[in-house]
Amino acid sequence: MATQDSQGIKLFGKTITFNANITQTIKKEEQQQQQQPELQATTAVRSPSSDLTAEKRPDKIIPCPRCKSMETKFCYFNNYNVNQPRHFCKGCQRYWTAGGALRNVPVGAGRRKSKPPGRVGGFAELLGAATGAVDQVELDALLVEEWRAATASHGGFRHDFPVKRLRCYTDGQSC
């Protein structure tokens, strides 16, 4: 696509000309790039893990800016930026970035909550019969009295479920 002439670079049908200053700066940059690999090779011998230290999590424990607790832990780098390490306080359960503002996360957020224990027992456990404090005779007597009151008010028959009237249509009239 790009071809270089003595006048400049031809790119997409348009010729871009060089000034004398631009060509000199390009030559200087090329010379600096040739010198930099030599410098990088010497620094690599001195500290082979210099690149790894930038990605490594911080070792220093930072106190929480809200509750001043030292029970904090490093979580991750915010937006994958090594200049913004994100921390979590176990005391007040808040996230914050070092040197940044404290996030307003409600207490209890940021941790997995345990599931509530399932109900093992049935009706007797709800009434407190698991302790043995409720007499079965009193419970039976209350149920019998309630049954008798309900049957008396409904003409001798207790309706536990609402009855839906069936409709059958023959010639437009209901049965």
Swiss-Prot record:
Q: Can the keyword Signal be found in this entry's annotation?
A: no
Biological source species:
Arabidopsis thaliana
Q: Briefly, what is this protein's role?
A: Transcription factor that binds specifically to a 5'-AA[AG]G-3' consensus core sequence. Acts as a negative regulator in the phytochrome-mediated light responses. Controls phyB-mediated end-of-day response and the phyA-mediated anthocyanin accumulation. Not involved in direct flowering time regulation.
Q: What induces it?
A: By red or far-red light. Circadian-regulation. The transcript level rises progressively from dawn and decreases during the night.
Which GO terms fall under molecular function for this chain's record? DNA-binding transcription factor activity; transcription cis-regulatory region binding; zinc ion binding
PANTHER family from the UniProt entry: CYCLIC DOF FACTOR 2, DOF ZINC FINGER PROTEIN DOF1.5
Q: Where is this chain compositionally biased, Polar residues type?
A: 37-52
Q: What is this protein called?
A: Dof zinc finger protein DOF1.5
Q: Which PROSITE patterns match?
A: ZF_DOF_1, ZF_DOF_2
